[in-house]
Structure formats: C-alpha cells, structure tokens
Amino acid sequence: VTSNNYVQSVSGGVTGAPVRGRAERDRAFRAAAAAGARPPRVAILGAGAGGLCAAIQLRLAGIDSVSIYERSDGVGGTWRDNTYPGAACDVPSHLYSFSFASKPDWSRKFAPQPEILSYLKSLVDTYDLHDTLRCRTEVTDLSWDEVGGVWILGLVDADGRRTREEADVVVSALGQLNRPFVPDIPGLEEFNGRVFHSARWDHDHDLRGERVGVIGIGASAIQFVPPVAAMARSLVLFQRSANYVAPRGDRPYPSWLRAAFTRWPRLQRAYRDSIYWRLEARFNLMRKDSRLGRMLASQFAKRLRPLVGNKLSEESLIPDYPPGCKRILIADDWYPTLLRSNVEVVTDAVERITPSGVVTADGQERPLDTLIFGTGFTSTEFLAPMRVTGRNGIDLNEVWKDGAAAFLGLSVPGFPNLFMLYGPNTNLGHNSILFMIEQQVGYMV
C-alpha cells in the first residue's frame, strides 16, 4: 500500500469528508497506519528552526519516516552560522520560540545567539530527533519521478560521495538566511587586508587597534558595529541609506519572573500572546501611505535632527523612504556609536576597492586593515543553487525567472508534495518569523 493511499485516507479523498482539526487528523493517521497504508517518507532540507519544527510536528502526527538533511555538522541554521559580536534576536525571546516548546527561563528580553542556539539544540533532545539527522549531507538537486510519484534527491556527503534517494514529500527548510551575499565590487580580490562576511565571522582575527571598514548597514551591522567600534582604532561605515532604528529596551529577566513563568505556564503564555499582539499592531505603520507611518517618519526625523552637525549629515541619519520599506531595526547603542570620535559614516557610493582601502564616488580613499561585509543574504534566490525539476521537466528557476511566488509561500503548481518554509513573500518586518514557520508547518502537516 503506497503513501498516496495513506494520504488519501487521511485527507478524506477516497473515504469521506476531509479531516479537520489536529485530534481528528491524528486519529485518521493512526487508522490509516492500522489499515496497512505506508506512511509517507518525508525529506526535510535544513536543520534550522524550520526543519526542526517540521520534524517535530510530523512525528507528533504519527509520521515517523522523516530525514533531515543538513550540509553543516550540526543543527541551528542561521543561529549556528552567525556568531559575530553582539549577535542576538531582534524579536522578544518568548515569541522567538515555538508555542509547543516554551522556554520559561529566557535570560533576557532579547536572547543572545548562544542561548537561541542552545534552545534549538534542546529540541533535538526533547523530541528525540537524533535518528532523523543526516548532517554533512547536502541535497544538490531534486527531480520529480512521475511514474513512481516520488522525489529523487541528489546527495553529496562531506567526502564528496554522491548518492540518490527517494522521498514521497520534500520540505525545504533552507530559509532565506543561509547564503551570505557579497557584492561584486571591482578590486575586492586585490585588497591586502583581511576580508570576511558577518555571517562567517573570523574569530581568529584580532580587530583591536585596526582600521576597520564595514560595507552594508542592516540588521547584522546594527549589532556588531558597536562592539567593533569599541576595539578598533578607527571604523568607517559605508552606508547606502539610513535606517529607522527604534529603542531596544533590552533587559535581563529577574529570577522571580522566570520562576513564575516556570510555575504557571499560563502566565508565560499570556505574556507571549501580549508580545504577539503588540508587534502585530505595528503592521499598520508599514502600510503604504499610512497616516501612522507618516507620523512615525516625522517624529523620527524630529528626534534625530539635533544630532546633525559637522560629524553626521542628515543623509546619514534620516531615512528618505517610508517606514517598512526596510526592516525597522532596534538598538540602544547605535547613535552613541555613530558619535564616537573613531567612527565615520560615509554615504557616498563605494566605487572600487584598492589593495589598501576603499574608494568612494567622491574619489576619496579610506585606508583599511580589515573589511567586513554586513550585506545580508541572497534572500530572493530561494532553493539556489539546488536545481529543482518538477512535472514534465519544468525547472523551478525557470518558473521563477520573473520573480519567485508560491501559494501561501509554501507550494508551487507543477511541483507535487514539495513544501517551502520561509518561502517567497513570507518574510516579516514586524513580528516573529518562528510564529510564521509554525503556522506553515501546521498547514503542511
């Protein structure tokens, strides 16, 4: 009995009305298994938050034939890779976690990277996912076998050995933050100093006393620039456009509150819900031509204009676009850092890189010892560089050549039983992406 029979019997396709609700769905799964139907084999790509969430919910639903393919040597995804100084969440900790795996003892309002990574690792132990992990194994291509009704996965391990395996369902949990983007700037390869991306931080390189340059000022730079400024001899920030930076208000949670959350889970749930609705209310700020957005932009400019002077220009401080066009950042130490005597903000475009520094459009060269890219990720190239071939030989890259799109950000016609978590048009600028992922997984399961 095939997995298609299993899915049909659960969905009601051949036996009755569609299943509604988790309890009814779980009973249907068990009934289908008892009838001898084979549960689907599910391949999950990526062992970050999305991949772990999918594996947990599939297992809780009675689907045990799950494999997580991870090209790295451990779980954690972006929280494994991003270890730069100051790395932390910009969503309150109690909402940057899954509702089914609450953590009442978060140390701070905005958890640091090591604590988030520890939380994700704990999910593997709590839900016994060790046997599902296929670390140091990368999926290079996916192709749909119409005759067998399965996906064929091309795999390569750490030793370069290539194999092929089958799966009835594929869940891509690669996300949008796995491939660092470094712009193609003339002369980059000629630079004599040290160069690295913030997502590949060089912890062996000592920045103390150095002349450091940062290209790209966004969500990562807003966190690592202040500690770098404190240790570098000089720091030049090459900024294309100013950001909206709201106060962070980070603070440690007192022991009594952590104890209360542990003793009374409903109290923590109420606190989590209050965070969600408070953040969700901010969406109105980001609507095009919204009155609230215009008010925020006006107040923001009014608050920052007193900082404009010989050191900082209006262009370097005040955005020339409405709130929400870029992610609104949060920090308490950003503007004090810009006012430091060893920090310079450059708004002229980067023209080229020389062996000794960076030349901007005004013709001026800033000599540097180290260049750090805070230029984000190739977040619009979903599933790249993996090749995905669906029904009738259609290539997903070809389908998306004019822009990526998917039903609910999850699935694309012509690619059966292929789901994407954190897919096209699912990024958020105001709330928790883990909440989004959990809802997508619930729909997918």
Region locations from a protein language model:
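Glycine/threonine-rich phosphate-binding loop and adjacent beta-strand/alpha-helix elements that clamp
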Residues: 374-445
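Core beta-strand elements of the Rossmann-like FAD/NAD(P) dinucleotide-binding domain
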Residues: 159-169, 208, 361-370
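Helical element adjacent to the flavin cofactor pocket in flavoenzyme catalytic cores
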Residues: 116-133, 327-352
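Feature captures the FAD/FMN-dependent oxidoreductase FAD-binding
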Residues: 108-177
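A conserved short coil-to-beta-strand element within the FAD-binding core of flavoproteins
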Residues: 135-150, 344-361
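Beta1-alpha1 glycine-rich phosphate/pyrophosphate-binding loop at the start
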Residues: 3-8, 40-133, 239-240, 306-312
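Short beta-strand to alpha-helix junction loop
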Residues: 103-122, 288-295, 321-333
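Rossmann-like dinucleotide-binding core of oxidoreductases
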Residues: 32-39, 45, 49, 53-74, ...
